[in-house]
Amino acid sequence: MSLLQDIVVIITGSASGIGLATATAALSQGARILGVDVSSAPVSLNEHPNYKFMQGDLTHETTPRQVVETCIKEFGGRIDGLLNIAGIMDQNSSVDSLSDYMWERCIAVNLTAPVKLMREVIPIMRQQQSGSIVNVGSKAATSGASSGVAYTASKHGLMGATKNVAWRYKQEGIRCNAVCPGGVPTGIVQASDPSTWDKDALGTMSLIHQAHAADRQKGLGVEAEDIADCLLFLISSQSKRINGAIIPIDNAWSVI
């Protein structure tokens, strides 16, 4: 029997990219999934009996609570895992070219929404005395030289929240970890408009980006499925003593 058989997991950003790859893999191993996304449900999972979908904007005040209420309605009272995958990029803006809108939107999607979802699931996990949360960061969560200031700050903040939650609830059977993908080809970059990017800031990071781009040209690039494998490991019992970890998945890009 799979280690994920019948566990209940909430996956945000499940309509594409890492979220879709993770939901697909989890379902293949017997998990029951509530997928959440601002976009419509992925056609590839529409007919799966263990996949339920909720469309919604996680930055809206009531959405995080509605997510948990929907999960309980669909699958009963348990929530075994929360995978905070949904995220957006900024315009690679430096602090002196940053708009209020981009700052507030990045913080809302990448930091506030995951924290509010953790706030909603923690009481259920405390009652169960078990549960695993994994937050998806980025190379920019541990570096100042790979993205704009808003995205970088939001992902650094999420790593701090991850560590705090891990320490606070470690004696109650609840784990909280993070993974930091680097250079995964998903729709997150394509969703932003290149004409609005801060070209000067991007130029200062070009050598960092080029160092990683060479891996993909040699067939060594990181794929969404690679991230999914680690996420599913972290919500399984095989990782039961891994708590508060920040795990890079970038073929050593994070060492520079």
From Swiss-Prot:
Query: Which residues does the entry assign to the active site, renumbered to this chain?
Result: 151 (proton acceptor), 155 (lowers pka of active site tyr)
> Does the keyword Ligase belong to this entry?
no
PANTHER family in UniProt: DIHYDROANTICAPSIN 7-DEHYDROGENASE
EC code: 1.1.1.-
Highest rank taxon of the organism: Eukaryota
Q: Does the keyword NADP apply?
A: yes
**A Pfam family name for this chain?**
adh_short
Q: What does the UniProt entry report for the null mutant?
A: Drastically reduces the production of andrastin A.
Alphabetized UniProt keyword annotations: NADP, Oxidoreductase
Which protein, by its recorded name, is this?
Answer: Short chain dehydrogenase adrF
The record, for CDD domains, names:
SDR_c (cd05233)
Q: Which is a GO BP term held by this UniProt record? A: terpenoid biosynthetic process
Q: Which family does it belong to?
A: Belongs to the short-chain dehydrogenases/reductases (SDR) family.
Q: GO: which molecular function terms?
A: oxidoreductase activity
Residue numbers binding NADP(+): 11, 57, 119, 151, 155, 184
Q: In which pathway does it act?
A: Secondary metabolite biosynthesis; terpenoid biosynthesis
Name of the gene: adrF
Coiled coil segments of this chain: none
Specify the species.
Answer: Penicillium roqueforti
